[in-house]
Amino acid sequence: EMWVSKRDLTNDEKLPGATLAIKDMDGNTVTTWVSTDEPHRVTGLHFGESYTLTEIRAADGYALADNITFRLIQKSDEDGNHLEECEVYYLTTKNILFWKWDDWKLLDDATVIMQDDITKVQISKKDLTTNEELPGAELIITDEKGSEIDRWISTDAPHYMERLPAGKYTLTEVTAPDGYAIAERMEFEVLPNGEVQTFEMFDDTIKVKISKVDITTNEELPGAELVIKDKDGTEIDRWISTNGPHYVEKMPAGDYTLTEITAPNGYKVAESIDFTVLPTGEMQ
């Protein structure tokens, strides 16, 4: 008999919930089981033959481990008589076709130890124009069933998570930082490996276009003094119109009033206009 112990790579503790299989060199499955918090006893393997320990499904939040090739050598007593006990050796090279005897290393206690690394996910919320980390966005991650997995406010560093089960997820921006438009939902997939998997969501700035036009020609009208105030009466921007539209960037979503202070010579002052900047960057 021999033993298989499934462990956490980060702390070497026993790891339940992984589906494992032992296959012979022809690829035939000899036995399968789900790991528990105790080593698994394996019997019925043949002395002298090589086998492969394969992880079919990792425990939630863990990466799939590499295959381990091993063989059983029957023990003998001092007189050369075979015993019903065995020694277990594992192959240190990944080339199972070409190896030397020195490539086989003896395992302690006839136990094959397979370790799983944890999954690592990094979420970056970035400014579309600068590609820099963007603080102040409220974000949530949901799984395929719509269950909330994590919620946080972005900072000037990526958001890091460990032990996220492999699978498909949706990243949603609940609220954008002031002056930015809410990004579209983003689907992503976490793979069962131990690498840091990075996903990025970009926010564009809100750009408000203000045109002062002649009502008869619909052409841009220079020379008007205009001001935008928020719902509290705080002045947001003031300018003199030109031959082109005026743009205001990073304007927080909310309600505003556009007022003409002075009209160009020969024109009457227009009535104030109330408008709303939506979180999507659109105007109403």
Placement of each model-derived feature along the sequence:
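Solvent-exposed loop/turn and edge beta-strand elements of beta-rich ligand-binding domains
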Residues: E1-Q284
